[in-house]
């Protein structure tokens, strides 16, 4: 498989750590919507890198977006704002999380559990950009 550029987003801080590690170990490049050095406000919101650094990973070639959700909630969390941007950019969405109460269910192209996140991202990219 070709090296993928994967935009990893988290419903809650830390949700995507294991998924990002798996992707990097498989040779893929991981991108984030947020800079770890930018603190969140009390509600959990923090500005994305487009606001703090003047560029967005989606301005470059992102092959697939991965949303890691560890909890069931019908409302998007502050860290999931990038899902909207990825949908608008036409990037395939893979979700590591349960479909129950998922506010993004209609836009998810592939759903997976943590153990198969690499394969799901590769399959989503191949389906979107393959021959």
Residue ranges and their predicted role:
Residues 2-8, 29:
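Residues that mark the start of a beta-strand
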Residues 8-14, 35-36, 67-71, 96-98:
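Structural motif
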Residues 18-28:
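A short, Lys/Arg-enriched amphipathic alpha-helix followed by its capping loop at the start of a domain
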Residues 29-43:
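A short beta-strand-loop structural module common to alpha/beta enzyme folds
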Residues 42-61:
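Glycine-rich, highly charged phosphate/nucleotide-binding loops
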Residues 59-79, 89:
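Conserved beta-strand-loop-alpha-helix hinge of the TIR/SEFIR fold
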Residues 85-126, 130:
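Ser/Thr/Gly-rich flexible loops in soluble cytosolic domains mediating phosphotransfer, phosphorylation
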């Amino acid at each position: 498989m070709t090296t993928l550029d994967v935009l990893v987003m988290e419903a809650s801080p830390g949700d995507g750590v294991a998924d990002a590690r798996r992707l990097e170990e498989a040779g893929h490049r991981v991108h984030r919507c947020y800079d770890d050095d930018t603190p969140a406000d009390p509600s959990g919101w923090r500005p994305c890198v487009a606001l703090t650094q003047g560029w967005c990973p989606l301005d470059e070639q992102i092959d697939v977006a991965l949303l890691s959700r560890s909890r069931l909630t019908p409302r998007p969390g502050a860290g999931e704002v990038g899902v909207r941007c990825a949908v608008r950019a036409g990037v395939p969405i893979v979700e590591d999380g349960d479909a129950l109460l998922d506010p993004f269910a209609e836009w998810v192209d592939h759903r997976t559990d943590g153990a198969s996140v690499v394969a799901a991202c590769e399959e989503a990219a191949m389906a979107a950009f393959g021959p």
